[in-house]
């Protein structure tokens, strides 16, 4: 009974985590450009 809920949570968290990492990398890249690296 718990497995479908758990898999749903995991499937929901994976895209959010990937999106968060993408945003963090993008912001770091932008900051690096501003510093002239």
Curated annotation (Swiss-Prot):
Membrane-topology annotation of the record: Single-pass membrane protein
Bilayer-spanning residue ranges: 5-25
Cellular compartments annotated: Plastid, Chloroplast thylakoid membrane
Pfam assignment, any one: PetG
CC terms in the record's Gene Ontology section: chloroplast thylakoid membrane; cytochrome b6f complex
Listed GO MF terms: electron transporter, transferring electrons within cytochrome b6/f complex of photosystem II activity
Domain of life per record: Eukaryota
Keyword Mitochondrion: no
Known role: Component of the cytochrome b6-f complex, which mediates electron transfer between photosystem II (PSII) and photosystem I (PSI), cyclic electron flow around PSI, and state transitions. PetG is required for either the stability or assembly of the cytochrome b6-f complex.
Matches recorded under NCBIfam families: PRK00665.1 (NF001907)
Homology family: Belongs to the PetG family.
Protein name stated in the entry: Cytochrome b6-f complex subunit 5
Organism: Pyropia yezoensis
Gene: petG
